[in-house]
Amino acid sequence: LTALQWQDVDLKKRILTVRKTLQRIQCQDGVTKTKLVITEPKSESSKRKIPIPAHVIPLLLKFQGNKNEYLISGKETPTEPRTLQYRFSKILKNVNLPSVHFHSLRHMFASRCIRLGFDVKALSEILGHSSVEITLNRYVHSSFEQKIEYMSRLK
């Protein structure tokens, strides 16, 4: 998310293209411990095109920057992933919600998509997973309420 630039967003076609990733890696120079690097995603399936829902376009238009600016920072330099987590934690605290990691939003998104009836293969591709097993086993979490609804369908 932190590696996305406006050049990766086609508002007319409503497509977001994931073509790079930002990560903190260990330095081998002995001077600094870690550094931020932008690289290609870890697998071919991680490189992907994601349809943007129509209702999101007005929000993106409101914040749209030049093609070299990053979506999250609004600048030509990316937001440090740790900064994103810190800001997310601060928002959760301010609205009295339990602390969770920012990455948990991917899990919540996947579970919600399944509850809404998304095809697992399509969801797996949206998430950039190499297989539906990764999506189902690591990202999709069933709720007890959902189980109640399923069981009530039995007659």
Locate the predicted segments by residue.
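Short, surface-exposed helix/turn micro-motifs that flank interaction/cofactor sites
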Residues: 2-3, 124
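Conserved tyrosine-mediated DNA breakage-rejoining catalytic core shared by Y-recombinases
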Residues: 3-62
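Catalytic-site neighborhood detector that most strongly recognizes the C-terminal catalytic loop/helix
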Residues: 9, 22, 57, 127-152
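Residue-level detector of conserved, well-ordered beta-strand and adjacent loop positions
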Residues: 19, 53, 73-74, 140
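Short, basic (Lys/Arg/His-rich) helix/loop patches that form interaction surfaces
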Residues: 50, 65-70, 74-78, 85-132
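Alpha-helix C-terminal capping segments
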Residues: 60-65, 151-154
